[in-house]
């Protein structure tokens, strides 16, 4: 397990609400909560920025974190991430915020403390461009969207 430095920005974390944790031993993501002052209503088509009450510092340039949606929020309520995926670089130290977009047809009330997203650590490989005149030919070649078929 990798150590992740965190600062609690909202004093309710650790008292009223637990620190982010893995739901099961096999979980890939740490659940992040909506650390709001009061419940908010997100109207259809509306996007709001919600604080998690934490800041993190990964520190290791071989790692980054992704903020991903929780599947139940999108499937049951139409609440997805406004930017689809949040990328947290290893040298970022600011507050974690979650952009929530209501893509549904009805208003959604986001309760204080609701688990709204998950934080997943991922390996990072930085690359440099090697400029070439031609690529080595492959079976796929330049075939784009849908080129590999559906079956």
UniProtKB/Swiss-Prot annotation:
An annotated Gene Ontology molecular function: magnesium ion binding
UniProt-listed Enzyme Commission number(s): 3.6.1.23
Metabolic or biological pathway: Pyrimidine metabolism; dUMP biosynthesis; dUMP from dCTP (dUTP route): step 2/2
Top-level class of the enzyme under EC nomenclature: hydrolase
Zinc as UniProt keyword: no
Keywords assigned: Hydrolase, Magnesium, Metal-binding, Nucleotide metabolism
Gene Ontology BP terms: dUMP biosynthetic process; dUTP catabolic process
Pfam families according to UniProt: dUTPase
Residues reported in the UniProt entry to bind substrate: 70-72, 83, 87-89, 97
Catalysed conversion reaction: dUTP + H2O = dUMP + diphosphate + H(+)
Protein family according to the UniProt entry: Belongs to the dUTPase family.
HAMAP family in alphabetical order: dUTPase_bact (MF_00116)
Family matches, as PANTHER family: DEOXYURIDINE 5'-TRIPHOSPHATE NUCLEOTIDOHYDROLASE
Record protein name field: Deoxyuridine 5'-triphosphate nucleotidohydrolase
Species this protein is from: Pseudomonas fluorescens (strain Pf0-1)
Lineage: Bacteria, Pseudomonadati, Pseudomonadota, Gammaproteobacteria, Pseudomonadales
Gene behind this protein: dut
